[in-house]
């Protein structure tokens, strides 16, 4: 008779990808929010099409107006339908600190991310500065508990993004990408896809992937 350990050994290990998106009012300018919506769908489709023995999972968070929301719970990409993916509308302020607390809660919850899961990848994209008190929640996320071990990537869009804060957020300097427009958003998400794909095909998915940023031109 098969033991519980045999069953667990056969079940694919989860690899969580957690995306936090800025949907504040400034994201409406120059088609940034539309590019973000397209890029998220393309990322999920690309990961869904990848043949892997890893249980790749995606969760979507966002912040804008006066709130931060969990828009899509952590779900295996194989089970995500296109009509389930949220379409973001840009408005209001940039309450980024609330999102840090929400992501922290998810990562520390072993009912959602079990101990056997691979280290999460956290992706943050923003074109502005937090309008709430983010310092405590970001410190908790990046320095304490299981979340401190996550791979953290970020994109700063335009000159108004808080570059210094994002430099502190990412787990390595190479994971901070600066962009200026909608085209750069799509290129960044390609980079995220390549980095995650590198991990799921690696013999050691918990080791930091070293993937060069794509330097080809991408037309939306």
Feature locations, PLM:
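Short beta-strand-loop
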Residues: 55-86, 163-169
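Acidic/polar low-complexity segments with low predicted structural confidence
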Residues: 1-15, 77-78
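Surface-exposed acidic, glycine-flexible loop patches that form ligand/cofactor-binding
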Residues: 6-10, 47-53, 108-117, 143-144
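VWA/integrin I-like adhesion module and closely mimicked acidic/polar interface patches used
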Residues: 34, 128-169
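Von Willebrand factor A/integrin I-like adhesion domains
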Residues: 159-210, 218-220
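Von Willebrand factor
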Residues: 9-72, 82-118, 121-125, 153-164, 180-191
